Amino acid sequence: MDRNIRDVDDVLKLLDGLFAPEADRWTADAAGWWNGFYGDRTKAVPFFVAKPDESLVAYVDRGWVAPGRALDLGCGPGRNSLYLASQGFEVDAVDLSDEAIAWARERTQEAGARIRFHHGDAFELAGSALAGPYDLIYDSGCFHHLPPHRRVSYLALVERLLAPGGQLALTCFASGAMGSELADADFYREPGLHGGLAYTPESLRWIFSDLTEVELRRMRDEPADSPYFGEDFLWTALFRREDTSA
């Protein structure tokens, strides 16, 4: 007899288990899949380029995001981490894949930058290796690979690690352009993430309604010779956590 559910973490792990192992992209058990993904650096994957997101550059150029402590969630080969470090940020970067981390470290060494890389599950590392508060939490393509129930964990991570007055910036699949448009409940009837979840502007505003929206728009499509990364099948969003201490 199995009567092991006692708290929210137990419920989340139970729901994780409803997905076939090969559909897992968000727990430490998914590291092998991501290692295979990052293992061939010659693949024509858009975000393998050594370019920062055009939206991130725009936030910094406009003065919306100022240098401070930054956390890059799902950093991959480190393209956005490197940009942040070049702009004077103190950067922690985390990824499930040690292949991605190794690649990012190589790029960092070549650039002569300083970034603290962490291999593992950000949800498990939050509060220990990933010790906030951070002035910026940056997520380029991690959020849309989470199953619906793990938004609870994501919001808890933001609540725990984002400084008052700090900002959350993310890119994710845009409804009608990329990603699955199944209703949340349907992912538990036919487990699998179908490549990632699409979001509408309304759904993003609702999910992050405890934060203040600064900007929410489609990412600008960047040509191949641009120094920036941009794909118009993505939303790019910037939210601020209000400082209520005053």
Where are these predicted regions, by residue range?
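Short catalytic micro-motifs in class I SAM-dependent methyltransferases
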Residues: 141-145
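A conserved beta-strand element that flanks and buttresses the S-adenosyl-L-methionine
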Residues: 138
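Conserved acidic residues
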Residues: 135
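Class I (Rossmann-like) S-adenosyl-L-methionine-dependent methyltransferase catalytic domain
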Residues: 1-73, 77-132, 146-161, 167-246
